[in-house]
Amino acid sequence: MAVQQNKKSPSKRDMHRAHDFLTAPATAVEATTGEAHLRHHISPNGYYRGRKVVKTNND
């Protein structure tokens, strides 16, 4: 089993963890309906980049 040769200081430990935070997903707003959706995904009502690409139940 690997054993560290020297103890990692709290400063070095925290610098190592500096990028472990969570980021919010990137969202976009559909131009025609104003609905928010994930980037590069269709909106819940079937629009993508201003065009209807999927038929939904309320059509």
UniProtKB/Swiss-Prot annotation:
Q: Give a yes or no for keyword Acyltransferase in this entry.
A: no
Q: Which family does it belong to?
A: Belongs to the bacterial ribosomal protein bL32 family.
Q: Name one GO cellular component term.
A: large ribosomal subunit
Q: Which GO BP terms apply?
A: translation
- Database matches in Pfam families: Ribosomal_L32p
What is the name of this protein? Answer: Large ribosomal subunit protein bL32
Q: Which molecular function GO terms apply here?
A: structural constituent of ribosome
Arranged from A to Z, the UniProt key words for this protein are:
Ribonucleoprotein, Ribosomal protein
* Taxonomic source organism: Polynucleobacter necessarius subsp. necessarius (strain STIR1)
